[in-house]
């Protein structure tokens, strides 16, 4: 199965989504399709053995829409006809390439399906065919298509306004007819085209209602123009105002939709176009597409990091807010990883390129956000059911309104009955209902991405809102995931520094995690070099021994010391480290006990505060771990967790989550290790912390790349704000239609007022969703919690 995000053109209203969804899902080989009107894209999963991109594009066209084609020029180093032909053949085999043309000057033009084909793949295919090329600028991308659509709509709006303006003046009826005809079949063609596409697929959208209303007004006015009666009015001007106002609403809707989709655009703009790459002995500026794996790239102050890689030399402070949501610069030194798209605040470094193109972290984030914005949340099902019957219902209501007015309220008054019927058609707004959920999800997931929280789907966002039970894995989630020296307990007369440095002198010869913890602590306490150790030996599970400064030193467990015949009575006066669930390392010199060191996997500094916030919000907090009960309870007590599941094997974790769900709880599992995978898979809401394994990340629907637990309350905050906004959108859309349609049927509204109200309802939904962009800017954690 293959997943693609395909850009779609000619979706003019939210009702188009259901039509295209059904058309794509009926195509053999397509497992699922999720269309997003606001993002103008479709997320499609299909079987490559059954169908292909050409068949999918053909089905999209048959449904009345278009799949645009991007153009990528590739400039060959040598303009040789035979080599160019071989390169063209190689390009045609690249996934996502629709066709290739060889220009007269030897330039290769690749025509691409809009699925994000990487220019590096195209260049690599050409190189494989013996033709080195330089990728040119991509034409017809997302930004180009969005600008083109907006400009076309603006031209149509201006033309409509220019045609309507003369109709507002006193004119001869036949001149009004000519101007009205130009208006109806000029700018009005915008609605006719969309309505016709819907009719061909037996679906009705807002544009069909507008076309029907406008056509009825036009035909009535045309009839009156050529009928020798003086008592009837012409409504060409009303028709023009109706079309112009709706076009204005459409244009404003496009502007607002562009703002709603700004998160992905901002992420894409983080990728610099060029970079300083080493070629020979010098660094030259090259397009990012020409960077290869292991190339050395120079990063200067104020520049964005062009690729994922490892620092080879130099030091810098990098702003990784695009990944973590936190703008505090992170110091980087040789050996540290840097992420493409992050901003170098200060310093200069040389980076060895590693992950390029679609393999980079930035590209993966963009794909996750795209997927989340296209996936439908469960709350969308209600809107889909209503929208399916909305337009036929409005047409029926309009027909009934006409009959009641023509036969009962104003008998034989065709003018009044027809205008009231058109009022009903004009005021109804299925788009507000169709936009309510996807715009909320788009803005909410985009805002979350800006804050370093990645939702993979709308369902995950909704489940996070519903979660009332949070289960933490211990190691690497509540704790730092690595042992650290926490206690220095010297015997009487022994200096703490002496105890630590003596143990570290011996442990520096070992690569055991406990040894690294001791050595790291000693180096933090003093810059002085550690004395060398001789005759070093390691006893598995017991400890280490050797000679330091001519004295025999032993560092290990009490049991081992007793086996070696060393008197451990002095340890009785020291704190009980075992009782605190810590590993005890006893240190002796020349057979005399000097003291003990306590080592433990320390809790994260923010863990206790986060748990307190979750509990204050009414969420039940659990900790699940494979550790012994004593260790688990010690950590739980430190962070404030009352419910502990200890000594749980990896294969038992999923069953533990299922038991909690069976009690009626909506469970959010937070983990990061490979043994969390089964539990993450069965939880209602699965959160993977940064640094987790690929398997864990695949099993989780929500990612916190920074690994910062403080993002968890913010996650719930954003999910709640998003679902609340969606519900308010749906309530407004339903309320508007339930009130406006009956009012219009009373005949008290002018068609222009109806058109204004209809446009305003859609724009209102979009603007209300855009308020989510401010979510999380203030330090508001769980604002729904009532103050006592």
Annotated model-derived regions:
Residues 323, 382, 419, 429-506, ...:
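Conserved catalytic phosphorylation-site environment of P-type ATPases
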Residues 31-37, 41-46, 95-112, 265-359, ...:
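Conserved cytosolic catalytic loops of P-type ATPases
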Residues 1-171, 282, 363, 367-375, ...:
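Flexible metal-binding regulatory segments at protein termini and peripheral loops
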Residues 485-619, 629, 641-657:
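P-type ATPase nucleotide-binding
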Residues 73, 77, 85-89, 236-301, ...:
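Juxtamembrane coupling segments of multi-pass membrane pumps/enzymes
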Residues 200, 219, 223, 227, ...:
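Membrane-embedded alpha-helical bundles of multi-pass transporters
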Residues 22, 31, 35, 145-274, ...:
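Transmembrane helix-loop-helix hairpins at the membrane interface
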Residues 85, 548-550, 583, 589-728, ...:
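Conserved ATP-binding TGD loop and adjacent catalytic N/P-domain core of P-type ATPases
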